[in-house]
Amino acid sequence: MNTFILDFETTGLNPYTNDVIEIAVKKYGEEDNFHTAFVKPKKMPKGSLYTYVPPNIVKLTGITDIMIDSDGILNSVATYQMFKYIVDNSDTEKPIYIVSHNGTTFDFIFFKRMVCEYIEK
């Protein structure tokens, strides 16, 4: 079965204006088979109290600017790696299903934005 569970951590709750800071994707039914990556979002304007991650999101996720600076990768690289993980762990003869807890109102909107930005580059 080609079912994958997708979860994003983001800089806020608006999927149209905020950015992804962490990707987690896991093949359903395979406990130790997953992919995660920190993603560098757009920097905040000069003079902001933080570079990437607002304090309320740090409190919620535990993800800090330091973690993003040291381990974050470009959005295009993160998107490529996410798709590579899915393709490498799929049976090419069967459809791929991607599920998410808040898919239609949150994660899938970010997912679509990432795909569109990747294709445009």
Per-segment meaning from a language model:
Residues 1-116:
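Conserved non-catalytic scaffold segment of RNase H-like nuclease domains
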Residues 117-121:
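Short, intrinsically disordered, charge-balanced linker/junction segments flanking boundaries
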